[in-house]
């Protein structure tokens, strides 16, 4: 009885606390802010170089930037904007030794932080879903993709996602749900236990993660089918036909390699978001007393914030040479597991997945 009373008093103290405790340090928040801004700026610089290369291409040449990279650019911009709009509020709280509730009249800083946090977390997941859907259509339904999907249409994805996120995350401002302050007083989020909005928000994120994983699995299966069909067609060719349109076969291998690179990048970003969202999902479905006692609220926020920091670094680290290395490892394992057909004339060639001649 006394423990539950103390827990409720602690919750009320966190929601109304005006000053930070003396042992609170801004070190973690500062490192996260610096890493987030630096990673996103480097990723944007690399993407800008690709955009400049695309602009310099002649009218008849192949463009160097794809719809997938348009969506990656929009994801990086979203992560950078979220980092720059959220972290400075936390650093201001530490510098003034005041909680977010006390930082501005009528808890405006607390409401601002909670709204931007929910908005950019949802927008990031919607961007990943858009990227996964683009890959699914490009690989699984190429005819529809060529006729209906364009790079110009990809530019409309960002405002559409922002519009949906704005409507959904504005519900607490319309009295469906409420934003409150959590310990140690440097962050605010959806109130736990008063309405079903927190569970609804977590469920939407979970459904998006499942949808992205479903799209990725479908793309993997389609790539495997394409690889097997291409290998069978090469094996069935006679020696005279093998001396035919070599540039076409080279283009097919390059296309397969690019699709595999896109899939690797998207898969790692999706796994990262799924791992970062797991503590938040657990927190949303826990009862309020247990979540506070086990400090799941603070873990959920930190994991959710880390995602916008990791995403750009994934893109920065997974440059083409690294992706080629990963593809070669995959090809090596595939070739070791697959038995060689005796007398096959194409056994000395690399598979399309490798993207190499």
From Swiss-Prot:
The chain crosses the membrane at residues 25-48, 67-92, 113-133, 153-177, 200-224, 263-286, 300-323. Belongs to the G-protein coupled receptor 1 family. The lineage of its organism: Eukaryota, Metazoa, Chordata, Craniata, Vertebrata. Residues 235-245 have a biased composition (Low complexity). It comes from the Eukaryota. Glycans are attached at residue 6. The gene is Ptger2. Receptor for prostaglandin E2 (PGE2). The activity of this receptor is mediated by G(s) proteins that stimulate adenylate cyclase. The subsequent raise in intracellular cAMP is responsible for the relaxing effect of this receptor on smooth muscle. Residues 49-66, 134-152, 225-262, 324-357 are cytoplasmic. Keywords: Cell membrane, Disulfide bond, G-protein coupled receptor, Glycoprotein, Membrane, Receptor, Transducer, Transmembrane, Transmembrane helix. CDD domains: 7tmA_PGE2_EP2. It comes from Rattus norvegicus. It is found in: Cell membrane. It is a multi-pass membrane protein. One of its GO terms (molecular function) is prostaglandin E receptor activity. This is Prostaglandin E2 receptor EP2 subtype. GO terms for cellular component: plasma membrane. InterPro entries: GPCR_Rhodpsn, GPCR_Rhodpsn_7TM, Prostanoid_rcpt, Prostglndn_EP2_rcpt.
């Amino acid at each position: 009885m006394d423990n539950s009373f103390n827990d409720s008093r602690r919750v009320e103290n966190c929601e109304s606390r005006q000053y930070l405790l003396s042992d609170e340090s801004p070190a973690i928040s500062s490192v996260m802010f610096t890493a987030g801004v630096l990673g996103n700026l480097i990723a944007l610089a690399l993407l800008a170089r690709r955009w400049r290369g695309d602009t310099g291409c002649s009218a008849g040449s192949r463009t160097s930037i794809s719809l997938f990279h348009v969506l990656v650019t929009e994801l990086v911009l979203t992560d950078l904007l979220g980092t720059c709009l959220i972290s400075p509020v936390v650093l201001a709280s530490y510098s003034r030794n005041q909680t977010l509730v006390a930082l501005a009249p009528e808890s405006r800083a607390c409401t601002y932080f909670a709204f931007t946090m929910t908005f950019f977390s949802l927008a990031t997941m919607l961007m990943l879903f858009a990227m996964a859907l683009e890959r699914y259509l490009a690989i699984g339904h190429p005819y529809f993709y060529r006729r209906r999907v364009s790079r110009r249409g990809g530019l409309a994805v960002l405002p559409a996602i922002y519009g949906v996120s704005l409507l959904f995350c504005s519900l607490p401002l319309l009295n469906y749900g409420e934003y409150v302050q959590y310990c140690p007083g440097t962050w605010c989020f959806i109130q736990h236990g008063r309405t079903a909005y927190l569970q609804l928000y977590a469920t939407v994120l979970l459904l998006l993660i499942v949808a992205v994983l479903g799209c990725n699995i479908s793309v993997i299966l389609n790539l495997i089918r394409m690889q097997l069909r291409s290998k069978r067609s090469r094996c069935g060719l006679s020696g005279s036909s093998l001396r035919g349109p070599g540039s076409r076969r080279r283009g097919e291998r390059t296309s397969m390699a690019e699709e595999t690179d896109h899939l690797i990048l998207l898969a790692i970003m999706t796994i990262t978001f799924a791992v970062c969202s797991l503590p938040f999902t657990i927190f949303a479905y826990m009862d309020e007393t247990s979540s506070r006692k086990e400090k799941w609220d603070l873990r959920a926020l930190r994991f959710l914030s880390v995602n916008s920091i990791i995403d750009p670094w994934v893109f920065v680290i997974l440059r083409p040479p690294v992706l080629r290395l990963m593809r070669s490892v995959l090809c090596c394992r595939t070739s070791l597991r697959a038995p060689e057909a005796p007398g096959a004339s194409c056994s000395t060639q690399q598979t399309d997945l490798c993207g190499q001649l």
